[in-house]
Amino acid sequence: MADLKTNLLGFVMNSPVIGASGTVGYGVEYEELADFAKIGGISGKGLTLHGQYGNKGERLWETPSGLINSIGLQNPGVQHFIDVELPELLELKQKYGTVAIANLGGHSEEEYVEGASMLSDSAVDIVELNISCPNVKVGGMAYGVKAEAAGEVVRMVRAACKKPLMVKLSPQAENIPEMCKAVEAAGADAISLTNTFQACAIDLEKRRPVFNNIFAGLSGPAVRPIALRMVWQAVGAVNIPVVGLGGIATGRDALEFIMAGAAAVQVGAANFANPRAMETIADEMAAWMDKNGVKTLDEIRGCARNAE
């Protein structure tokens, strides 16, 4: 019988399958739909220091093999999360062992640091730092584009945060290996990648861009091979765990990331198509392992790299 248990930053998870931020709410919304005993962790909806209403206009747009979103980090703010949503997330942990991950964004170094400090004093298990947010001090360029800027914000957050720190990287980074090395040197305990890919859609009838901000984030099966390439690069660049995400929709998809060296995986857009996607992926992983005589994920983690 396959054993999917996965150790991530000292937390032993039921499986390597984590719900990606922005696709599973704060976990409790899925409790009646999914078997949480098969889910390793939940990365809650992205937070900012202060609550945000998010973007106006269209927010979701389907593509032939993916989903474009322009939510705009709508969230209640860090303190509200600590007071209201986190206790519900921790109830899931108590019932099922699901690791509680807080995803934190920000629009300045000061916002990141204050938010991380508050989360550091909370009962959350892991802080996932979203550095795809625009830096208002440099004309809106995302922190996750240049390694130097990313390293600086991670260094500042590391000093303020006692919790295990996982940094979520953008595929728009100028150089993925250098970005990974920069955030590792700055104190990241783990890396997750990739975030969504910048995309655009045009409404032919309205003769204008679908989204008010013109560009938005593409996720889903279309991006998976590119995300897998970036995870491969990341694993080869650093000595900290890499959590892979981007278009994972089946157990075979997840196993590709594991064989590339990922410590765990996150599932995002697939949850919109199938609210039981996470447990289905875990089941499919276990079935493949049983069929192929693999007892634990450690037996195959990074095995594809032997061909290098």
Q: What label would you give each PLM region?
A:
Residues 224, 283-308:
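Extended, intrinsically disordered, low-complexity segments
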Residues 54-64, 202-216, 258, 270-295:
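C-terminal helical cap(s) of enzyme catalytic domains, especially alpha/beta-barrels
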Residues 48-53, 134-136, 198-201, 272-274:
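Short gly/pro/ser/thr-enriched loop/turn and capping motifs at secondary-structure boundaries
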Residues 248-252, 274, 306:
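Small/polar glycine-rich anion-binding or flexible loop at a beta-alpha turn
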Residues 1-100, 106:
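N-terminal capping/small domains of soluble enzymes
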Residues 4, 17-20, 40-44, 100-104, ...:
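Hydrophobic faces of well-ordered beta-strands that scaffold small-molecule active sites
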